[in-house]
């Protein structure tokens, strides 16, 4: 594959997915174990998440992605692209005030949030923003179960 013939990150990922041996592409160290993601896992997660996102956005809508560096970040970014959305990445070090400014500026239709720590920073902002149609979490948040 010649990199100058690749049009976008989705195409690059798919080319790699097609040619790799389907072993682990990511290793995520967790508290007491390592979570492995195979190429097939990542591919199927991108498709599933993209299908979910597509229910709530139209082409060109923004999706705010609040996450640490972890495999789900890349999966989310590619899923947003596949859905026709625009990823608005946000640092996890932002304050509630920072997030409110970003949310007001980009009007995201979907929020993708890594964990409870990040959710608590924007929890009070969400009810005021009628344009937010869906919140997706990487980790389980008790409040939403």
Region locations from a protein language model:
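Conserved AMP-binding/adenylate-forming core of the ANL superfamily
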Residues: 25-74, 78, 95-100
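Structural core segment of the AMP-binding/adenylate-forming
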Residues: 86-145
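Generic alpha-helical structural signal
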Residues: 10-14, 43, 47-50, 123
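AMP-dependent adenylate-forming
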Residues: 12-38, 142-143
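Short hydrophobic alpha-helices that are characteristic scaffold elements of the AMP-binding
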Residues: 77-83, 105
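Residue-level preference for short coil/turn positions at secondary-structure junctions
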Residues: 20-22, 59, 107, 131
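Flexible, non-catalytic linker and terminal segments flanking ANL/adenylate-forming cores
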Residues: 1-8
């Amino acid at each position: 594959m010649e990199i100058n013939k690749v049009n976008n990150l989705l195409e690059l990922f798919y080319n790699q997915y097609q040619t790799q041996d389907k072993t682990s592409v990511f290793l995520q160290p967790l508290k007491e174990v390592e979570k492995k993601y195979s190429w097939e896992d990542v591919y199927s997660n991108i498709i599933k998440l993209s299908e979910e996102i597509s229910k709530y956005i139209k082409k060109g809508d923004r999706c705010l992605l609040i996450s640490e560096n972890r495999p789900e970040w890349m999966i989310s970014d590619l899923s947003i692209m596949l859905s026709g959305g625009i990823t608005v990445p946000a640092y996890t070090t932002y304050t509630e005030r920072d997030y409110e400014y970003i949310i007001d500026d980009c009007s995201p239709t979907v929020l993708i949030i890594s964990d409870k720590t990040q959710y608590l920073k924007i929890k009070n902002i969400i009810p005021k923003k009628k344009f937010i149609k869906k919140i997706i979490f990487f980790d389980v948040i008790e409040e939403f179960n």
